A protein has these predicted regions:
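Long, contiguous binding/interaction regions
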Residues: 1-96
Length: 96
């Protein structure tokens, strides 16, 4: 997107469970690509179960959030669910 263009954005939380440690590098790459939109990230290693629980707070266009969540959910051994705020705001486009 070009800078200076307004777009509708929503705040969302993506909840991620990683059961396959080999997917973590690819997951981190996807999150890095969305870094301009990520508000915060919390990761909890649940060693007793051998899984990682990750929560991502994001403020971005809805199609970008849906795309990111879909890409994450297609990783082997990774599941993702997204909850959206009902509030839609205008924001200046980020340079991706």
């Amino acid at each position: 997107m070009r800078k200076g263009i307004e777009m509708d954005t929503r705040v969302a939380v993506i909840s991620i469970i990683v059961e396959n440690p080999e997917a973590i590098v690819t997951l981190n790459d996807l999150l890095h690509e969305a870094g301009n939109y990520i508000i915060g990230r919390m990761g909890i290693p649940y060693r007793e179960k051998g899984i990682n629980i990750i929560r991502i707070a994001i403020d971005a266009p809805q199609d970008m959030i849906s795309s990111l969540s879909g890409k994450i959910g297609r990783l082997k051994g990774v599941s993702a669910k997204t909850a959206y705020s009902n509030i839609i705001t205008k924001a200046e486009a980020q340079n991706d």
